[in-house]
Amino acid sequence: LKSGATCIAYETIEVNKRLPLLEPMSEIAGRMSVLVGGYFLPKHFGGSGVLLGGVPGVLPGKVVVLGGGSSGINAARMAQGLGADVTILEVDVERMRFLDITLHTAHTLYSNRAHILDMLPEVDLLIGAVLVPGSRAPKLIDREMMRVMKRGSVFVDIAIDQGGCAETSRPTTHHDPI
């Protein structure tokens, strides 16, 4: 500040309600969330043993994505590419229409506590991809809701850099993500 320099946090630059400089990182985070989450689903990692894409005679895994922004749509695309059954919960109806047209086989559902609770008992991989520009992420999942998830399910919270979207979320590292 003493130097008189003008400093700009690039990730917060907003153009037409979008964060264009944050988008590339969000795209990567969304895609990686499915790969990393799927990696921890085998039983030897404490997961449920579900293969996200399934195989003939076995249903695919269920992936639920909270938030349909850049991270969320990329998580959904990656999960669809693996053959998973994908549902995206979103609060913006126009965005849901876009997701429906763009992702074809993914289901969209209005995001609220009741719908999240309905999804949790069956989810194999839950991805938190909510972003409120300039604010902390809303806490969509509390401790009691986490207990509803089946044993061995995996939760990846992309929103952790904004405080996480679950009450139990805490920062981890790529080296030690659990």
PLM ranges: what are they?
Residues L1-G61:
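Glycine/serine-rich phosphate-binding loop and adjoining beta1-alpha1 elements at the start
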Residues L1-K17, A137-I178:
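Rossmann-fold NAD(P)-binding glycine/threonine-rich loop
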Residues L19-L22, R77-M78, F98-I101, A166-R170:
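Short acidic, glycine/serine/threonine-rich loops at helix termini
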Residues P24-E27, L103-L109, T172-H175:
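Short, hinge-like loop/turn segments at secondary-structure boundaries
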Residues G46-G128:
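Glycine-rich phosphate/diphosphate-binding loop of Rossmann-like nucleotide-binding domains
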Residues S70-A76, M96, G134-L140, G163-T168:
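Short glycine/serine/threonine-rich phosphate/pyrophosphate-binding segments
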Residues N112, L131-G134, A159-I160:
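Short glycine-/small-residue-rich Rossmann-like dinucleotide-binding loops
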